[in-house]
Amino acid sequence: MTKKMGVNAALNLFKTALSIIFPLITYPYISRILGVENLGKINYTASIVGYFSLIAALGISTYAIREGGRIRSNSEKLSHLGNQIFTINILSTVVSYLLLLLVVWLFIPNREYQILICIQSLTIVFATLGVDWINVLFEDFLYITIRSIIIQILSLILMFVLVKTANDLYLYTFISVIGSGISCILNLIYCRKYLKLSLVWKLDLAKHFKPIMVLFSGGLVISIYANSDMLILEWFKGAYYVGLYAVAARVYTILKNLLASIYSVTIPRLSHLFGEQKIDEFKKSYTQILSVVTLILIPMSAGLIVLSREIILFLGGIKFIDATLTLQLLAISLIGAIFGGILTYGLNIPIGRESVNLTGALYGIIVNIGISLLLIPVFKQNGAAVATIASEFFIVLYNFLVVRESGKYIDFVIWRKNLIQALLGFFSIIIIGFGVKLFVTNSLLLIFSITLVGIIVYLLELKLLKNPLLDHILDMVKHKFRRG
């Protein structure tokens, strides 16, 4: 991993970490003010809007980052590509809104749901006009991080000041999306330093259509199986159980996004290396990224299993206690989700294998919906969690079986050593966690003590095992202090 990639990963990790801290501050308050059912309504309508956000996005962001990464040194070609992509994105956004209006008119008579969808759908146009893919393409993660901090602080203040009762459902929803609007305005101004976008009448659809549609189809299918459990749960059991599932899914999603932030920033650089056929350098960088994620992911899932009850009580209170097992199941799913993500997004996208992602996601949704229909009527929110586990691990298995030349891009000898050390950390944290619970009963103290002791013991294990990645990080820190 190059120094630039390391800095970008650190910045993106920090930005995503803030997305954990801020919900930890706001969610306990919001869940108690709005209640289980209102949170279920918000999550249900958000899942509907999510599908139309995908139609508007059309896989364009990923396509722009990959293709732009290969030609970003040529300003003329990049400007042409940017204008083409921006115009296509505007057209897809218009189509998305027309389809959303039609669906709401025909299938969603509930007035409350209609208003929530109307508010949440603002994020669609904000995302299109925000053109955040330009910042990622030019690896300007410092700006992205600073912008994110400012917007999240503003949203936090507005929530605590304005949301006071369960009747503030619409106000809370509006505050949740207004950050996207502010981000959009800031980006429209800031991104002009890189690209001055404009609409064009002549589109080269023959060139862009197929790869964009493959990426869009893959994203749509992934979104369907990501949201299908929530939709099926609402259909069979109602908003209450969606609310229970939502609090566990929120923790799961936050941690998934945190880990994904490590590898998502590498797409422009890996695309550049692959475009120049620097395969050895590609293999070294990708293996390091995979190893770093593995060393963090496996022990993190163990900590989540141990602390699920305490986390649920902290976030939602005793009303959400039935979501404990749900979160423990999703902690297992987290492993499959991240390995699947680093294979599909971190490897297949840079090497142009997005068609594999699409096929794998199609099979994944069949697995997810099939198991959801079978288990949700009986096991409610826990059945939805099991369906998520099955689909996530299926996608990992499918990718390993289909991308047969993965050994060309991954050094499995190095990765296996890190995997074994991560598994050792997994069992250590499980033992430590349940051991500490014998002596400590306070939920917040449990979260703090198990997290602190678990991290210290795990780092000591890695040091004793002479893990090269940890040694490299420690050497960098020592060198930094000596220079300072």
Spell out what each predicted region is.
Residues 1, 145, 169-176, 185-226, ...:
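Interhelical loop/hinge segments that connect adjacent transmembrane helices in multipass membrane
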Residues 27-53, 169, 207-215, 233-253, ...:
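Interfacial/gating helices of multi-pass transporter permease domains
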Residues 15, 19-23, 27, 45-53, ...:
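Short runs within selected transmembrane alpha-helices of multi-pass transporters and secretion channels
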Residues 1-22, 76-79, 83, 202-218, ...:
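N-terminal membrane topogenesis motif
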